[in-house]
Regions:
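NUDIX/MutT-family hydrolases
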Residues: 91, 95-132
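Short aromatic/basic micro-patch
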Residues: 34, 86, 112
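Conserved N-terminal beta-strand and adjoining loop/helix that marks the start
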Residues: 1-21
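Conserved Nudix-box catalytic region and its N-terminal flanking loop in Nudix hydrolases
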Residues: 18-61
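Active-site segment of metal-dependent pyrophosphate-handling enzymes
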Residues: 59-99
Length: 143
């Protein structure tokens, strides 16, 4: 039985000119949109993984992590190469000062989207729920 895997990433948000935009990446293999994330290496913490993967996939290093936001989702994965295994993905929330253009060899496309557009692009309910919680957390800070 293949070993369970862990991954981590960020819900990245840029707030400029009164608008809140979220970064989404479109997977080049299966076309689904999601947040920057990747698998953990060795003994990395989820935060270390999220920082490394975000830097590798987006080039963005100027992040302000929002304290207290951490969401994990565990689900079954089946691939021809690895077989069936359990994967746990942890997401953190961070701001970045500008909506930088992102190019990644792992992704077919990328973009910064408002909440409604981002929610429509996210195909997986767990990612939609993560986005919803991120939006609520950001609104709560202002209140």
């Amino acid at each position: 039985m293949p070993k369970d895997r862990t991954a981590a990433g960020f819900v990245l948000v840029c707030e400029a000119k009164g608008q809140r935009l979220y970064l989404l990446l479109q997977n080049a293999r299966h076309g689904a949109w999601g947040f920057p994330k990747g698998h953990s290496e060795d003994d990395e913490t989820p935060m270390e993984t999220a920082l490394r993967e975000t830097r590798e996939e987006t080039g963005i290093t100027d992040l302000q992590v929002v304290p207290g936001f951490e969401i994990s989702d565990t689900y079954q994965v089946h691939t021809p190469k690895r077989g069936e295994y359990r994967k746990t993905v942890t997401y953190f929330l961070a701001r970045t000062p500008k909506a930088a253009h992102v190019q990644s060899h792992e992704h077919a496309a990328s973009g910064w989207f408002d909440y409604t557009e981002a929610r429509e692009k996210l195909a997986f309910p767990a990612l939609q729920e993560t986005l919803k919680k991120a939006e609520a957390a950001l609104k709560g800070e202002k209140g």
